[in-house]
């Protein structure tokens, strides 16, 4: 349904957040340096789906759920309905299948138009013919703000070391 968005995501760092050899090497180094005391510090941003599924922090990617291996997918942002601020990736993704509501910066006007038009042959009910589609898109203003991304894109280690400052750099540019 969103081929351009999918194509952009599929070659982005978000798509490789959990599978990246650089990430996995860095995480292994941090684990070794801290004797494993960093817990879920890295994976809660690199694998929020796995965290919400209750997967262990230290687990082979081969043993993870296929969706968990996809890194930061659409649902990581579009299934959040609360503003978290800077919580270092501790996000509670609203669970559900394709038919459950999604959240976005614009709300549901376009979705309603697509559903009502009949042109797209979409289906909002399980077991019915047609392309399955979300039943509702609710407005989530925070998704349209740059601060939303700061939840994961400012990384301060427990000793105060600023590992990544992407959001702060953007904010101060």
Region annotations inferred by a language model:
Residues 3-70, 81-144, 150-173:
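Sequence context of c-type cytochrome heme-c attachment sites
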């Amino acid at each position: 349904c969103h081929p351009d968005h999918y194509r952009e995501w599929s070659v982005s760092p978000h798509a490789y957040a959990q599978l990246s050899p650089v990430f996995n090497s860095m995480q292994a180094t941090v684990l070794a340096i801290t004797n494993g005391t960093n817990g879920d510090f890295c994976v809660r941003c690199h694998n929020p789906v796995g965290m919400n599924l209750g997967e262990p922090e230290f687990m082979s990617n081969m043993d993870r759920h296929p969706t968990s291996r996809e890194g930061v997918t659409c649902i990581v942002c579009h299934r959040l309905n609360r503003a978290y601020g800077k919580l270092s990736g501790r996000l509670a993704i609203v669970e559900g299948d394709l038919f459950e509501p999604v959240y976005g910066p614009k709300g549901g006007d376009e979705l309603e138009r697509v559903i009502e038009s009949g042109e797209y042959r979409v289906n909002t009910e399980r077991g019915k013919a047609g392309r399955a589609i979300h039943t509702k898109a609710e407005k989530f203003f925070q998704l349209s703000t740059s601060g939303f991304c700061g939840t994961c894109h400012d990384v301060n280690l427990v000793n105060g070391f600023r590992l990544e400052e992407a959001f702060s750099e953007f904010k101060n540019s």
